[in-house]
């Protein structure tokens, strides 16, 4: 959404852009950075109403400052990338004219999307797991809990704070 065209005016006529076309294509998946900064509450609600949990992928678009304290970080290649500033949980270019990727973590996306849209938690979790796996064509391997799939699991509490992570059936030590 950040770099996409929306409704615009050409002479006296209004024409739809890529965003509106995406809403009209039922089979199209949309990727959403639901960090509470990139998109306002009302747009997240509209996206959820139009596309539903089976066509929304929650994506972090995170850079190396994700999960780190506010400060200076590099976007892209650590030697030749862009300098960025992370302030109040938002990555920005140094002149503060634009976002510079995201510093959101997946749990933040789930928490924020649920809080802003009131979508059921099971649907929001699907948007961060099974729906992206389907888009990538790997839902037979991951994205849900089933015999024969990778045991990539997280456990979180009622505040959607992660307390346990398992990758390929092996617990990660924090």
Predicted region positions:
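Divalent metal-binding pocket/active-site signature
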Residues: 1-17
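Flexible, active-site-proximal loop/turn residues at the rims of small-molecule/cofactor binding pockets
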Residues: 4-6, 36, 160
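Loop/helix-junction capping segments adjacent to catalytic residues or to phosphate/diphosphate-binding pockets
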Residues: 9, 38-41
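His/Asp/Glu-enriched, well-ordered alpha-helical/loop segment
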Residues: 14-32, 36, 43, 48-60, ...
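Short, Lys/Arg- and Gly-enriched loop/turn segments at beta-strand edges
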Residues: 159-166
């Amino acid at each position: 959404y950040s770099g996409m065209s929306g409704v615009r005016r050409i002479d006296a006529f209004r024409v739809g852009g890529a965003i509106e076309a995406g809403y009209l294509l039922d089979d199209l998946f949309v990727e959403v950075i639901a960090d509470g900064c990139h998109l306002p509450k009302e747009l997240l609600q509209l996206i959820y109403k139009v596309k539903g949990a089976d066509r929304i992928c929650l994506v972090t678009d995170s850079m190396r400052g994700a999960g780190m304290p506010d400060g200076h970080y590099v976007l892209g290649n650590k030697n030749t990338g862009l300098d960025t500033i992370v302030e109040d949980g938002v990555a920005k270019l140094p002149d503060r004219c634009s976002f510079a990727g995201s510093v959101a973590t997946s749990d933040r996306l789930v928490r924020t999307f649920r809080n802003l849209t009131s979508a059921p938690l099971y649907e929001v979790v699907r948007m961060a797991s099974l729906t992206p796996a389907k888009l990538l064509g790997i839902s037979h391997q991951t994205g849900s809990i089933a015999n024969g799939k990778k045991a990539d699991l997280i456990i979180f509490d009622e505040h959607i704070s992660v307390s346990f992570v398992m990758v390929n059936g092996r617990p990660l030590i924090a």
